[in-house]
From Swiss-Prot:
Keywords annotated in UniProt: Cell membrane, Cytoplasm, Membrane, Nucleus, Repeat, Tumor antigen, Ubl conjugation pathway
Polar residues bias: start-end ranges: 85-96, 104-130, 219-244, 268-320, 329-344, 364-380, 414-428
Subcellular location: Cytoplasm, Perinuclear region; Nucleus; Cell membrane
Taxonomy of the source species: Eukaryota, Metazoa, Chordata, Craniata, Vertebrata
Record flagged with keyword Cell membrane: yes
Gene Ontology biological-process annotations: negative regulation of transcription by RNA polymerase II
Positions of the MAGE domain: 491-690, 745-936
Region feature (Disordered): 1-455
Compositional bias of kind Low complexity: 138-162
Subunit structure: Interacts with DTNA. Interacts with TRIM28.
Interaction with DTNA: annotated span: 743-957
Name listed for the protein in its UniProt record: Melanoma-associated antigen E1
Mutation effect (T664N): In a breast cancer sample; somatic mutation
Length: 957
């Protein structure tokens, strides 16, 4: 006999048994059976087909309910709920072709299934599952003479129906709803391989119903729970590994329902939680196996639904949380590697919904965030999963939903969105990134990235319609808190552009015009210039500690004031514009001492006495005429005005608005006192004026404990700066330092300053004899005093140091410490950089052992392309500038000389700089010359121990 004939006979025999058994049920459950109480419907019992409790579980569509779950190659399942009239109908004769609900589940490990919510809230429709022991799904569609398996739900007034599944691998099952409120249940246990075991629900007050499972390995145990307010119902599942357990919980809220699932079974387990408002339902789903687990939580507002998903299977796990209430729905997903976890959070409620997705799973993960206004939803994704992920985003207007996608898997990721008809719907778009590293913007500390994940990585970008500038990016490998990126507002972008322009423009020290600032603002936002300027000023003050001050209200010019604090005063040579600022302070002091105004001729006369001539260009600050009449005036340090009623036209200098903001009269007066070696109170009138100005400033600033600090160019000298006279007070002279008149001393000192400035461009040392020849031999009596006055002026005004180059010959030179420390390569003539071989010669001498024969240096210069006659000129110039010194080689015949570093070379450069210079030429590292490198390191340590050189000269005779 063929296999088809055997299956047909078995189906006919099972249908006959089910028909006979259903007939006995009809006799036992007559509506007017004696000995039973009258049918009094409770408050929670549906009253008719149109009752809200029945309509509560229905979807929008009205067609028959058909849920066919796909195999691994078919795609997602389709679920069509029934209409109200069809869901509440009952059939007396259980044929295979009558029920409106048909659900064919796939076998384990063949695919994934996603099922929507139940169609009827009070009735139970139990689906039919193919046997798990048969491996892959071998189900076939019905032929023309056959009908699909049917599940007939109860009517509105009936209790939940009972599903009679077939034995494993034999066919489909038929669920026939019982009539209402009949006698106690009777459980008939069939023999092995014959049929299912059915437990019929007892009436109220009759006690609990007990279901004894099958003893065979292929039997089925079905438990129908007790009715309202009665004792608990206990369902003992089959011990076989292939049976199906379907617990149906009570419909009232007082009695808790406990369902103990099959432990080793492979079939699906379906748990329908109570629909009442106050009851608690705990559903323990199979811990092992390959079937699917479906948990339908209560629909009331206060019920607690806890669903523990399978821990080791390959099937799907579906958790449907409560829909309207404020209860808490917690879904713990399976930990298997290939299962599907679907979490549907509460829709309108206020309670939080937490969905923990599978951790190592390879299957599809579906998360439906809440749509309620007050509830929050937190979804934690799987970390190493290899399967596809499904995310359903919230659509409610007020409810915050934080949903995070799972890790990238091997399969594609599918994005679903819930279809709620509300005003604020976040728009979603899929962004494919080339590399998984891009998604590591926000990763939880406990999560790990995918190991060996391939394929594109996806982000979901949510843009709020009401706030278009707010974009939420929720990507893979993130948790709990999603990344929220806010694109730059156009106003903030204009503020950033203006801020950058102000910082760059301030470096030139020129006033910033309003018209220039408007050019960096987009035309559409120029009418909001005051607000943009206010925001930029706030950023400058909070971040960069600059104060934006309006310089001239009529011209609409602005400047930046530094508020970082005072910088210790160590001479203006430490500032980038030290010589220029020193000259400016001299001019401001002259204007202040002359009655707050000074004619141009008087200023130039004062500068000429200081060694600065109008038409002579100096290497320190360039063209003096342009510096005064153009640069200082443009920077608004000075005001340059013509004198009225004067022919020919003359001009006067005044303090500019920037000078009033960045310095004070008291600071300028103290500066002039240092220059002239006096006390500020030696000018009593000016001293009182400076005190009045300080008092007015303090009153205007509200007696602030921390006054506004300005740029360090005008910071007064610190008290700890030693007086120059104290360092040279031990000079030996038979004349007192102030035996000459003060005016004559000042005149000689200014002449000495002029000499040093003129000789500085030649890099030649200035001997004492040459100085006395220039200023007069009679000055030898007061030479130390004159030299100290000149050194003080050169330091404070021009930012240079007067140092003793050779104590034996009493030669002097100017030294700019800041410039030399920052300069890596020195030159012997700034005006002829192409003809300088100074660093080459010094490096050659150092590499040769700190001394080199004259013939070797000349050969080295010939190798650099120097002509035969030029080598003598170069070495003679270096000798005269004291960059190198010549020493006679002892016992040499004929007499020979060797070159060593001179005092100027040791002053302006170091051995480490020379070694780095050689390394750059030969494309090596300084460590490639280990002996010279150690010597250079020792030289650097010695220089650090000595510290700063004394800026004032001494050792005078």
């Amino acid at each position: 006999m063929s296999l088809v004939s055997q299956n047909s006979r078995r189906r006919r025999r099972r249908v006959a048994k089910a028909t006979a058994h259903n007939s006995s049920w009809g006799e036992m459950q007559a509506p007017n059976a004696p000995g039973l109480p009258a049918d009094v419907p409770g408050s929670d019992v549906p009253q008719g087909p149109s009752d809200s409790q029945i309509l509560q579980g229905l979807c929008a569509s009205e067609g028959p309910s058909t849920s066919v779950l796909p195999t691994s190659a078919e795609g997602p399942s389709t679920f069509v709920p029934p209409t109200i009239s069809e869901a509440s109908s009952a059939s007396g004769q259980p044929t295979i072709s009558e029920g409106p609900g048909t659900s064919v589940l796939p076998t384990p490990s063949e695919g994934l299934s996603t099922s929507g919510p139940p169609t009827i809230s009070k009735g139970l429709c139990t689906s039919v599952t193919l046997a798990a022991s048969e491996g892959r799904n071998t189900s076939r569609p019905p032929t023309s003479s056959e009908e699909p398996s049917t599940s007939v739900p109860p009517t509105a007034s009936e209790v939940p129906s009972t599903s009679l599944p077939p034995t494993p691998g034999e066919g489909t099952s038929t669920s026939v709803p019982p009539t209402a409120y009949e006698g106690p249940s009777t459980s008939v246990v069939p023999t092995p391989d014959e049929g299912p075991s059915t437990s019929v629900l007892p009436t109220p007050g009759e006690g609990p119903g007990t279901s004894v499972p099958l003893a065979a390995t292929e039997g089925l145990s079905t438990s129908v729970q007790a009715t309202p307010d009665e004792g608990p119902s206990t369902s003992v599942p089959p011990t076989a590994t292939e049976g199906l357990s379907t617990p149906v919980p009570p419909t009232r809220d007082e009695g808790p329902s406990t369902s103990v699932p099959a432990t080793p079974g492979e079939g699906p387990s379906t748990s329908v939680l109570p629909a009442a408002s106050d009851g608690q339902s705990i559903s323990l789903v199979p811990t092992r196996g390959k079937g699917s687990s479906t948990s339908v939580p209560p629909t009331a507002t206060e019920g607690l639904s806890t669903s523990v998903q399978p821990t080791a299977g390959e099937g799907s796990s579906t958790s449907v949380p409560p829909t309207p209430g404020g209860g808490l729905s917690t879904s713990v997903p399976p930990t298997a590697t290939e299962e599907l976890s679907t979490s549907v959070p509460p829709t309108p409620g206020e309670g939080p919904s937490t969905s923990v997705l599978p951790i190592p799973g390879e299957g599809l993960s579906t998360s439906v965030p809440p749509t309620a206004s007050d509830g929050s939803d937190t979804s934690v994704p799987p970390t190493p999963g290899e399967g596809a992920s499904t995310l359903v985003q919230p659509t409610a207007p007020d409810g915050p939903g934080s949903s995070v996608l799972p890790n990238p898997g091997e399969g594609p990721s599918t994005l679903f969105s819930s279809s709620a008809s509300v005003d604020r719907n976040p728009s979603k778009c899929s962004l494919v990134l080339p590399s998984p590293r891009v998604t590591k913007a926000s990763v939880d500390s406990d999560s790990e990235g995918p190991k060996g994940a391939e394929g594109p990585i996806e982000f979901e970008v949510l843009r709020d319609c009401e706030s278009p500038n707010s974009i939420s990016i929720m990507g893979l490998n993130t948790s709990r808190v999603a990344i929220t990126l806010k694109p730059q507002d156009p106003m903030e972008q204009n503020v950033a552009e203006l801020l950058q322009f102000l910082l760059v423009k301030d470096q030139s020290k020129y006033p910033i015009r309003e018209s220039e600032m408007r050019e960096y603002i987009v035309k559409e936002y120029r009418n909001q210039f005051p607000e943009i300027l206010r925001r930029a000023a706030a950023h400058l003050e909070c971040i960069f500690r600059f104060e934006l001050r309006e310089l001239d209200p009529e011209a609409h010019t602005y400047i930046l004031l530094n508020k970082l604090g005072p910088v210790p005063f160590e001479g203006l040579e430490e500032s980038p514009n030290g010589p220029k600022m020193g000259l400016l302070m001299m001019i401001l002091g002259q204007i202040f001492l002359n009655g707050n105004q000074a004619k141009e001729a008087e200023i130039w006369e004062m500068l000429w006495r200081m060694g600065v001539q109008r038409e002579r260009r100096l290497s320190i600050f360039g063209n003096p005429k342009r510096l005064l009449s153009v640069e200082f005036v443009w920077q608004r340090y000075l005001d340059y005005r013509p004198v009225t009623d004067c022919k020919p036209v003359e001009y006067e200098f005044f303090w500019g608005p920037r000078s009033h903001l960045e310095t004070t009269k008291m600071k300028i007066l103290k500066f002039m006192a240092k220059i002239y070696n006096k006390d500020p109170m030696d000018w009593p009138e000016k001293y009182n004026e400076a005190l009045e100005e300080d008092a007015a400033r303090a009153f205007a600033e509200g007696w602030q404990a921390l006054p506004h600090f300005r740029r360090p160019f005008f910071e007064e000298a610190a008290a700890e700066v030693p007086s120059p006279d104290s360092e040279v007070s031990s000079y030996s002279s038979k004349y007192a330092p102030h035996s000459w008149p003060e005016s004559r001393l000042e005149s000689k000192a200014r002449k000495l300053v002029q000499l040093f400035l003129l000789m500085d461009s030649t890099k030649l040392p200035i001997p004492k004899k040459g100085i006395l020849y220039y200023i007069g031999r009679e000055c030898s009596k007061v030479f130390p005093d004159l030299l100290n006055r000149a050194a003080r002026t050169l330091n404070h005004v021009y930012g240079t140091e007067l140092v003793v180059l050779d104590p034996r010959n009493h030669s002097y030179t100017l030294y700019n410490r800041r410039e030399m420390e920052e300069t890596e390569e020195i030159v012997d003539s700034p005006n002829r950089p192409g003809n300088n071989f100074l660093m080459q010669v010094l490096s050659f001498i150092f590499i040769m052992g700190n001394h080199a024969r004259e013939s070797a240096v000349w050969a080295f210069l010939r190798g650099l392309g120097v002509q035969a006659g030029r080598k003598h000129v170069i070495t003679c110039r270096y000798l005269s500038q004291r960059y190198i010194d010549s020493l006679r080689v002892p016992d040499s015949d004929p007499v020979q000389y060797e070159f060593v570093w001179g005092p100027r070379a040791r002053l302006e450069t170091s051995k480490m700089k020379a070694l780095r210079y050689v390394a750059r030429i030969h494309r090596k590292e300084p460590q490639d010359w280990p002996q010279q490198y150690r010597e250079a390191m020792e030289d650097e340590a010695n220089r650090a121990d000595v510290g700063h050189r004394q800026i004032f000269v001494h050792n005078f005779r």
